[in-house]
Regions:
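Short hydrophobic/aromatic-enriched beta-strand-loop microsegments
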Residues: 15-16, 75-76, 92-100, 167-172
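Catalytic core of the metallo-beta-lactamase
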Residues: 2-8, 105-166, 181, 185-189
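Cap/insert and terminal regions of metallo-dependent hydrolase folds
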Residues: 44, 49, 74-86, 143, ...
Length: 262
């Protein structure tokens, strides 16, 4: 869905992990597709930074967060989201909360930037009591961008200009509908956002595990392939668990794994 394990600058980062079989407050809603639950919290090594983009159920999972607690060095999240972690037994000193454009700086030029997104937040009956965000992961050699959930907007071009482009952009590209395109990008928006960000490679996300919209499960893959033709970035569509190594070659064949068995 939107879970990424990243090794960068000698650090291990885990982004929006959801290892549960459902992404909702009840077990019978938003259940994972068969065959997509390949990993558990027990499979994860120690994590230097746990990044959470916002507190929707498909990005912040109680069972996953509590199972990871002993392995996490620092939680990084937008304003208000840290309260969930403190309620779930994380020490306050381990949680870094920030507004848009806040920066958590480490040694050797490593930095995590909390950046704007166009979305909303809330769990159960609460709504918009916490902030939502994307992240830029920066070292002297590499720059990676994660959009979180976001509709298309001018913030992508502004972020691209601010950072001078990215080696890899991991962008929202699923669970969309014309009725809510201001909070979730259509695949064509995702392609434009990658170009705005000056990304050398695009890895579309928010797709492949949960059905939270009305489109078919493979529609995002087909549409992003079409929308990316002629774009200046390389499109990456890995299988769940397939590693992607930086730097990424400028071209390469797309394995259309979603067409297997047809």
């Amino acid at each position: 869905h939107s879970t990424y394990f990243v090794q960068l600058g000698g650090r291990r980062l885990l982004i929006d992990p959801v290892f549960s079989t459902y992404a909702s407050p009840v077990f019978f809603a938003n259940r994972a597709f068969e065959g997509t639950n390949l990993y558990t919290a027990e499979d994860m090594p120690d994590i230097d930074y746990l990044l959470i983009s916002h507190d929707h159920w498909d990005h912040l999972d109680y069972a996953t967060a509590t199972a990871l607690r002993s392995k996490v060095g620092q939680v990084v999240c937008p304003l208000g989201v840290g309260a969930h972690f403190e309620a779930w037994g994380y020490g306050k000193e381990t949680v870094f909360e920030g507004d848009w454009y806040s920066v958590l700086e480490g040694k050797d030029g490593f930095a995590i930037h909390i950046l704007p997104a166009r979305h909303f937040s809330g769990r159960s009956l609460t709504r918009n009591k916490t902030l939502w965000a994307g992240f830029a992961l920066v070292t002297p050699e590499r720059r990676i961008f994660f959009s979180g959930d976001s509709g298309y907007g001018k913030h992508f071009a502004e972020i691209g200009a601010r950072f001078g482009g990215f080696d890899l952009a991991m962008l929202d590209c699923g669970q969309y509908d014309e009725n809510w395109r201001y909070v979730h990008m259509m695949p064509e928006d995702t392609a434009q956002a990658a170009e705005d960000l000056r990304a050398r490679a695009l890895l579309p996300g928010h797709v492949g595990k949960f059905a939270i919209a009305y489109h078919t499960w493979d529609d995002p893959f087909k549409r992003i392939v079409a929308a990316s033709r002629g774009k200046p970035y390389r499109l990456l569509l890995p299988l769940i668990g397939e590693p992607v190594a930086l730097p990424i070659a400028s071209d390469g064949e797309i394995l259309r794994w979603w067409e297997a068995g047809r």
